[in-house]
């Protein structure tokens, strides 16, 4: 199959994005991202050469991005890919010894195949004289996540879900807090709580709430619903988790054909945007890729949405045809319901491109127009595919090829590759260090750059002040109030607006959204509480991380890293390696500040980072300024500006 590529389109990508693609997504023989884009476009075209060409043109123009495994595991020619093109899996954990052992085996295989896993533990009986409860088993899962992964590309990741009514909910809530019995902790896992309508109604009414053993329904304890809710919010504010999964809302929106089969949603996935049924014989799959809303005006009148629905149906079929017997439940689920999850990124970039403030009715209007259009196009294509290829087996008579079509994943890596705002969330800063699987990169808001250029203020002094203010522009006297509103950062926004936008688009999204919330460190408890309550009241299916403003690392770094002078050497040195985006950004920062330095390539001199620094380090860059040891890139940023690098662990599997 012939697909014409244009290597000049590499110029549309930042250098660090190209480095990231080469390090994690391209095959060894692929010299350009365009070659990787061609490989994936052909692989997922279903043999349609015209579709393959369109897919290549879309992705090379940054209109969408393949999910990480869809790109990295796309086969070349008629061979098989390095792994499965599935981002994540959702598994049900039965309340039997056989089921628990089987879950462990399946989990290990799923991690090796490269997918993050959401495990649903609500039916495992509580602690008793004859049963240890779910926590010790979760401790073993915690160890598995360290051991099992797909090569260097995808680390094993796991999110455990438990009903709020489970008698072990308090211990489950605290299992990621590193105090207490280490044998009952799971520090490498994520946790999520299935929040029911009954519980929320008890919270509002100030009533007691029953904790029931899932084995027989026996009430083990009655507690204050409000106190439990307050504890949940407190732990979220402290650790960023647990995710909240509004399980009854999700089940109400399950397609009727699946309800008629007695299926139900028992939890979500690693990133809380996938809402599919699981059972003892069904492991749901996440088949993802995402549109770039920043370029909505360019692609809205094309067939891109329809083409991507068709492409994802092809990806799903490849998984069904090639999945090994070790993941037979996932294959069965994919075959029966054929769910896909077309997502989006770049929403905040789209607003800023048009000079629209996040906290505005105009933003709500754009939000509705965009997602109404995506939904209509996706539904039209699945109906076309049903005629062409047949309806999904669990939905005969539905007129659809796929039981689910849309899901908004976090898109951390995809957003970095396309230099756009991640997912449907606001930008964290207008100049910041963004941490992803490939490292940390300095990112500047290009729409702000355009405004600064028009005002004659696009200079080192302005950007240094923005970085010093942790990415904020509210201090800049030459910006008017409207411009300051457009470029508010995530933590400067009223978080109620994030919930409002999510609620406005939810009717057009059959699955869910990875909705992060951002609060300053000293946020009022009543404000944080109200935003969370509104998320349930307004019909969201869940909430992902709660991000709080981190303290400046400047002092912490000085405590962690001994800053000693090199003996008889007061040079500034950057020890680096080729194709290292961290190194390139470090040197850019030093040049920006007029700091002269020597660049030393460790590969050329045949030394390791540990050897040249005399420290137990194995990463680059390693930086000295005037003989003083600084450390890596993030340490450099803290040393130069006191700016806070972006905290928190992004979803490592569902970066659609």
Protein language model regions, located:
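Extended catalytic cores of very large enzyme megasubunits
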Residues: 1-563
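Structural micro-motif
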Residues: 145, 541, 614-624, 633-634
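Short loop/turn microsegments at loop-to-beta-strand junctions
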Residues: 402-404, 570, 618-620
């Amino acid at each position: 199959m012939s697909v014409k590529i244009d290597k000049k389109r590499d110029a549309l990508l930042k250098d660090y994005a190209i480095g990231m693609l080469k390090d994690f997504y391209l095959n060894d023989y692929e010299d350009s991202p365009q070659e990787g884009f061609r490989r994936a476009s052909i692989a997922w075209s279903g043999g349609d050469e015209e579709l393959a060409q369109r897919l290549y043109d879309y992705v090379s123009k940054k209109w969408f991005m393949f999910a990480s495994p869809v790109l990295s595991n796309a086969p070349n020619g008629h061979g098989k890919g390095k792994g499965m093109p599935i981002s994540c899996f959702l598994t049900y954990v039965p309340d039997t010894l056989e089921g628990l052992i089987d879950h462990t085996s399946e989990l290990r295989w799923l991690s090796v195949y490269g997918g993050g896993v959401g495990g649903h533990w609500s039916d495992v009986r509580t602690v008793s004289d004859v049963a240890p409860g779910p926590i010790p088993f979760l401790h073993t899962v915690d160890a598995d996540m360290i051991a099992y992964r797909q090569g260097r590309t995808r680390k094993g990741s796991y999110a455990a879900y438990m009903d709020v009514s489970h008698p072990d909910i308090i211990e489950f809530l605290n299992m990621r807090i590193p105090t207490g019995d280490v044998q009952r902790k799971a520090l490498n896992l994520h946790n999520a709580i299935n929040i029911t309508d009954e519980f929320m109604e008890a919270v509002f009414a100030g009533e007691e709430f029953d904790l029931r053993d899932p084995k027989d329904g026996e009430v083990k304890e009655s507690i204050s619903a409000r106190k439990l809710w307050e504890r949940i919010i407190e732990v979220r504010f402290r650790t960023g988790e647990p995710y909240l999964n509004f399980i009854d809302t999700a089940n109400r929106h399950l397609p009727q054909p699946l309800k008629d089969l007695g299926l139900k949603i028992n939890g979500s996935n690693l990133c809380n945007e996938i809402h599919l049924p699981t059972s003892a014989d069904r492991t749901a799959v996440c088949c993802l890729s995402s549109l770039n809303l920043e370029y909505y005006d360019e692609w809205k009148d094309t067939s891109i949405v329809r083409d991507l629905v068709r492409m994802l149906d092809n990806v799903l079929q490849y998984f069904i045809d090639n999945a090994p017997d070790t993941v037979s439940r996932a294959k069965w689920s994919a075959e029966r319901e054929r769910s896909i999850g077309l997502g989006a990124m770049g929403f905040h970039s789209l607003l800023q491109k048009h000079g629209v403030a996040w906290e505005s009715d105009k933003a709500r209007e754009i939000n509705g127009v965009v997602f109404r259009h995506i939904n209509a196009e996706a539904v039209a294509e699945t109906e076309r595919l049903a005629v062409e290829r047949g309806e999904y087996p669990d939905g005969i008579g539905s007129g659809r090829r796929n039981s689910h079509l849309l899901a908004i994943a976090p898109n951390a890596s995809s957003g970095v590759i396309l230099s756009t705002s991640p997912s449907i969330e606001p930008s964290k800063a207008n100049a910041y260090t963004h941490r992803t699987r490939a490292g940390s990169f300095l990112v500047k808001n290009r729409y702000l750059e355009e405004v600064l250029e028009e005002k004659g203020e696009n200079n080192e002094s302005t950007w240094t002040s923005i970085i010093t203010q942790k990415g904020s522009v509210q201090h800049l006297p030459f910006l008017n109030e409207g411009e300051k509103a457009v470029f508010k950062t995530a933590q400067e926004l009223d978080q109620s607006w994030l919930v409002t936008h999510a609620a406005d688009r939810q009717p057009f999204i059959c699955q869910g959204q990875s909705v992060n919330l951002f609060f300053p460190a000293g946020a009022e408890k009543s404000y944080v509480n109200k935003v969370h309550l509104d998320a349930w009241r307004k019909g969201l299916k869940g909430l992902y991380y709660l991000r709080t403003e981190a303290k400046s690392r400047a002092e912490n770094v000085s405590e962690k890293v001994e800053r000693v002078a090199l003996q008889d050497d007061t040079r500034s040195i950057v020890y680096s390696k080729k194709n290292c985006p961290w190194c390139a950004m470090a040197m850019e920062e030093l040049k920006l500040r007029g700091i002269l330095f020597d660049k030393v390539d460790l590969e050329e001199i045949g030394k390791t980072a540990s050897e040249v620094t005399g420290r137990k380090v194995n990463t680059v860059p390693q930086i000295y300024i005037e003989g003083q040891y600084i450390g890596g890139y993030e340490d450099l940023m803290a040393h130069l500006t006191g700016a806070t690098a972006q905290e928190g662990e992004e979803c490592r599997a569902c970066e659609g």
